[in-house]
């Protein structure tokens, strides 16, 4: 009987060991499967994250390039506006320098000779030019002054003059600002071509 108990104990040990080994193998197999699933999921997630990061990077790059292009366009437009403004200011200064007393006197006399044959006209000058030119114009225009031609000071004119029919709708602006604006509009297409070359 002693052998039987011993055999029985050995059999229980053996069966327990086999069961434990079987259970351990099953646990290991499940752990390996779970680990493989985790690795596959991690690889899939990593791949998705990488694709998402690449897409975001490409989108950011596209937006950055578009923003850079827009900034360059804005810079070109701003530079062109600044150059135009400088050109226009220089043009106005040049025209104003040409409008000295001699030039104004000669221009007013020519305009009056051509235009005032049958019309009554008003000529408006700035106050400074009015004071400087009135006596010279009286001498040159003579008896037509005050009757057919009236010369008046006007604060709104910096350099040059305006001329208009007294009772009519005709009005001409020979101010330095207007002449400079007309010249600028005439020169503007040529100016744009020069800027494009730069």
From Swiss-Prot:
Membrane-crossing segments per the record: none
Q: Which InterPro entries match?
A: ATPase_V1_Esu
UniProt keywords, alphabetically = ATP synthesis, Hydrogen ion transport, Ion transport, Transport
A GO CC term attached to the entry: proton-transporting two-sector ATPase complex, catalytic domain
Annotated GO biological processes are:
proton motive force-driven plasma membrane ATP synthesis
Q: Does the keyword Ion transport apply?
A: yes
Instruction: Identify the SUPFAM superfamilies for this entry.
Output: V-type ATPase subunit E-like (SSF160527)
Name a GO molecular-function annotation: ATP binding
Please name the NCBIfam families in this protein's record: PRK01558.1
Q: What function is annotated for this protein?
A: Produces ATP from ADP in the presence of a proton gradient across the membrane.
Name of the protein in question? V-type proton ATPase subunit E
Gene source species? Borrelia turicatae (strain 91E135)
